[in-house]
């Protein structure tokens, strides 16, 4: 919520207030558990404790999927969730990042994807450094450039038709709809050679 001499505004999410009133994050306060906001007819506002506070147990469903990704805390949490997947992903592809393409579905998974990519790039940087150091100065300039040229492979592999929402369909019709809701970017990977890693946050009714 935000209160000034001219306005009192309450919203379910902080970024909305920041955008409308052009406020820094420090100016928007959070109503704590057990508290209420009472606004009188004359404009006086009071924040009161109406119930003893209990343990805070935020819903991961809301933090991962429903909340606005433009909130600074939500953004950083989603990036961290992606970064934390790094080691398990590397194990699943046998640490073969040269034959693995990374992408995301749907667009709301993009923030976690950035965190995953940062984790993967940090891992690859360590591999490059260790390989160069292990050769004890015996590498030529061309060999060093070859090592440094290794990159995490990333592509926009699936493009969703924004008019179609699979989780609101029912039964067999949903399976048929889900099969056509994404358009694949053809030629971006080699069948039978490349691994494909997709980060997906469709936890409502993911397909």
Describe each model-derived feature in a short phrase.
Residues 1-189:
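N-terminal segments that mediate ammonia production and transfer
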Residues 195-207:
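A phosphate-binding catalytic loop at a beta-strand-loop-alpha-helix junction
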């Amino acid at each position: 919520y935000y209160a000034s001499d001219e306005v009192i505004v309450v919203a379910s999410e902080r970024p909305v207030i920041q955008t409308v009133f052009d406020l820094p994050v420090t100016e928007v306060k959070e109503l704590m558990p057990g508290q209420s906001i009472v606004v009188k007819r004359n404009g006086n506002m009071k924040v009161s404790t109406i119930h003893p506070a209990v343990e805070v147990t935020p819903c991961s469903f809301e933090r991962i999927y429903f909340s606005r990704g433009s909130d600074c805390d939500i953004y950083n949490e989603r990036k961290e969730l992606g970064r934390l997947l790094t080691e398990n992903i590397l194990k699943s592809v046998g640490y073969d990042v040269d034959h693995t393409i990374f992408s995301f579905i749907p667009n709301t998974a993009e923030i976690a994807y950035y965190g995953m990519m940062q984790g993967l790039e940090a891992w690859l940087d360590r591999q490059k450094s260790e390989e160069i150091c292990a050769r004890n100065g015996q590498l030529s300039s061309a060999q060093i450039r070859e090592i440094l040229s290794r990159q995490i492979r990333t592509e926009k592999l699936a493009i969703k038709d924004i008019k179609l929402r699979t989780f609101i369909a029912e039964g067999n019709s949903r399976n048929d709809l889900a099969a056509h809701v994404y358009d694949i970017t053809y030629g971006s990977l080699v069948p039978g050679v490349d691994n494909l890693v997709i980060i997906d946050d469709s936890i409502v009714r993911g397909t």
